[in-house]
Structure formats: structure tokens, C-alpha cells
């Protein structure tokens, strides 16, 4: 149908060239249907999980912030959620989970007992794999892997 040449405006050099053989006239594009959990997981390179941290002598906000920092540096999309008393924790978790986020939930024992709908992507046994920041982050990273590929250091390509 025709040829094209792309020229860089700054350097005035040829950036690309090609041949158009046919025109796609279909009405739908790359994503057919709605953007759902699977699409978000594929784009982010991670599966949404909620990791429950119950406050104790060892587990405090600083500890969870350190875990979040390690995960964030590794390219995970994280959110540290420390709800105040009276918040609808289950509703907030539902929305964060739909968004494809790794949620680090810092709660006291009473709040932990009040949470409904703990799904298969709700992790409470993280301490069985160690209690050091790096060990916990490695366990969460493993649990939030999308498919077979593990994204590290923001390397999505």
C-alpha cells in the first residue's frame, strides 16, 4: 500500500522506515473486553496479594516499611495499609486487590480477627519463612509472582 520514513525532529536523521502492506480495519484493538485482574497482573508483572502483619514486639510499622522498601526497589507495586479503628478493612482490601497491588496490611489482633473474606491470596503465615526483612520480602516476592516470570529491579523486558 505504501512506504513510510520517520525522521527525528531534533537530529533530522532517519529514525525508522517501513512498508505498509495492509490496514487493520477491525473495530477492536489490543485489549478486547474489560481491564480485569488478569490484565492488571500481566501489565504489572505481579499477582495481587494481601500480607497480614499483626502488631507485636517484633512486627511494627518500621519493620513493615522496611519490607515495603525492599519490595518496591525490586519493582513490586506495593501499598502499606495500616487502617485506623472503625475502617471497613475488607472493602479497602477488595479494591486494592482488584487494582493488582501487593498490600502489606498492618493491624492489631482485634482488627485481624474482624477481617472477612480472606481469600487464597491472603497471606498470614509469612513468619514461617523467617522474620528478617529480606526473608519476608523474598517470601512475598515469591507469592506474588505472575505466571512463571519473576520481575526484579523493575526489569519488565
Language-model features, listed with the residues they occupy:
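Structural motif
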Residues: 54-58, 82-84, 106-110, 127-130
